[in-house]
Amino acid sequence: MNIQQAIKQIIKKQDLSENEMHKVMNDIMTGKTTDAQIGGFLVGLAIKGESVDEITAAAKTMRSLVKSVTIKNTKHLVDTCGTGGDGLGLFNISTACTFVVAAAGGSVAKHGNSSISSKSGSADVLKAAGVNLDMSVEKISKCIEKIGIGFMFAPFHHIAMKHVIEPRKDLAIKTIFNVLGPLTNPAKVPNQVMGVYAQSLVEPIAYVLKNLGSKHVIVVHSKDGLDEISIADDTFVAELKNGQVSTYTINPADFSLPLGNLNDIKANNADYSLVLIQQALDGKDGVAKNIIALNSGAAIYVCGLANSLQKGVNKALNILNSDVAHQKLDDFVRESTDC
C-alpha cells in the first residue's frame, strides 16, 4: 500500500492494518513521500482517530530507524517521558522525577526534547542545570550504568523525523507523532510512566505498549488536563502489569497528600523551572515536592523498586526529605561531561 491508497482508505474512516501502516510510515520516514501527502495522511488519521494497531505499527517503524542506546542491565530501567501538549506551562515534572528514581536505585533512560508547546522542555532545564547534552550513545549508556541517569535528546536519535518537521509545523495540530516520541525510547525501556495529552488516549496507549513488549507501564492523564499525575485533581490511569491492562482513578488524598494549586508550579522559563526542581530536591515542602513525589513514586513502582504505588510514593517522599536526589542531579551534571 502506498500513501495515496492509505489516504483514500482513512478518509472513508477505515483503519489500516499493521502491515499497511508500517509500509506507509516507512515510506514517510525514508523520504519517499511529499510534504502534501504527509499532511493529508496525518490529517486523515487525526480525523478518523488512530487505532491501537496503527499506533503500534508506527512506533515499531520508528523504533527500527532509531539511533539506539544499549543498556546491559534493564531490570530497573524506566522512562518518564510524556507527550506534553497540556498547555499549562508547569515546571518540568518528569525531568525532576529522574533524580528521585535514580536515588531510589532505579536506572532512568530519559527521553526528551527542547521546548515545543511548553515554556521549557526537558532538554532546556537540563542545559540550564549545566548538563552536557551532546553525548554519544556510548557515553549515554555509561552514564546510565554508572549513576542511573542518561538523557537522550530526541532529534539526535530520531534523525528520520526530519521528513515530517515541515508538514507538522504547517499543520499545527496534534497528530500521531505527538504520541510516538514517548513510545520510541532509544534504550527500549521495559517500564514507563507515560503521560498523555487526552483522557481518550490513556487506555489505548497502554495496549500499544503491551503490543510493543513493555513489562510494567502506567499511562496517565489528569482531570485538570495534565500529562502527569496531578496534585490538584483526579488522575485517570491505565496500568499494564503481568500482561494485563487495568484502569482506575487516583487522587492525592489516596496518598495522604493535600490538594495543591497548579499556579504555584508554573514556570515561564527553564531557569525558574530549575529553581522549583532544586528546591523540591532539597526537601522544601509544597506543591512542587508533592507532585514530584506522586510521579516519581509511580516510576519507582513500575521499575520494580516498590510493590505498590502507595509504597513508591512513600519512598519518593523519604528521598525528597533527604539530599540524595539533589546529589544525583549534581552527579549527572558532573558525569555528563566525562563519563
Swiss-Prot record:
GO terms for cellular component: cytosol. Its EC number is 2.4.2.18. GO terms for biological process: L-tryptophan biosynthetic process. Binds 2 magnesium ions per monomer. Anthranilate 1 binds at G82, N113. Mg(2+) 1 binds at S94, E228. GO terms for molecular function: anthranilate phosphoribosyltransferase activity; magnesium ion binding. Anthranilate 2 binds at R168. 5-phospho-alpha-D-ribose 1-diphosphate binds at residues 82, 85-86, 92-95, 110-118, 122. Homodimer. Catalyzes the transfer of the phosphoribosyl group of 5-phosphorylribose-1-pyrophosphate (PRPP) to anthranilate to yield N-(5'-phosphoribosyl)-anthranilate (PRA). PANTHER family: ANTHRANILATE PHOSPHORIBOSYLTRANSFERASE (PTHR43285:SF2). This is Anthranilate phosphoribosyltransferase. It comes from Ruthia magnifica subsp. Calyptogena magnifica. The lineage of its organism: Bacteria, Pseudomonadati, Pseudomonadota, Gammaproteobacteria, Candidatus Pseudothioglobaceae.
